[in-house]
Regions:
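Residues embedded in well-ordered secondary-structure elements
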Residues: 5, 45-47, 112
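Sec-dependent signal peptide recognition
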Residues: 2-9
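Flexible, solvent-exposed short loops/turns enriched in glycine
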Residues: 68-100
């Protein structure tokens, strides 16, 4: 009986111990916060989004490459899928039979090239972090 209790106790201790996640933030995606006021100071192109605050994020799809998305403030946790800003993101969503679930927040006729380049830069920085830290 004592061996059984000892075994169960040891199993519970091991099973409930937290796993070290020192590289959890280097999963391969990244983001940058953007806002209308700061955009006008840093970029010559007009702010392309209909909301004052949001997040440009980047991820990687094995078949389509680097994906760039925009999510308005309040829709940026992992349960949301942002609006795709580049072809890779749109193709990845279509391929995976997924859809954006955030409010569409892109100005009509907006030039998204600067926003996409910002997202791709985030991808580059994240990949560099992965190379240097793993």
């Amino acid at each position: 009986m004592n061996k059984l209790m000892l075994s169960l106790s040891l199993l519970l201790i091991v099973a409930c111990s937290p796993v070290a996640q020192e590289h959890d933030d280097l999963y391969g995606s990244g983001f940058i916060n953007v806002n209308e006021m700061q955009w006008s100071l840093e970029h010559s192109s007009p702010y392309p989004f209909t909301v004052a605050y949001g997040e440009i994020s980047c991820g990687f799809h094995p078949a389509f490459g680097r994906e760039v998305y925009f999510a308005p403030e309040g829709f940026t946790d992992e349960s949301y899928i942002g609006t795709p800003l580049n072809k890779a993101a749109a193709n990845a969503l279509k391929y995976d039979d997924m859809h954006s679930n955030v409010p569409y927040s892109i100005n009509t006729g907006a030039d998204l090239s600067v926003a996409v380049n910002i997202g791709l830069k985030v991808c580059d920085e994240q990949q560099e972090s992965l190379k240097n830290n793993v």
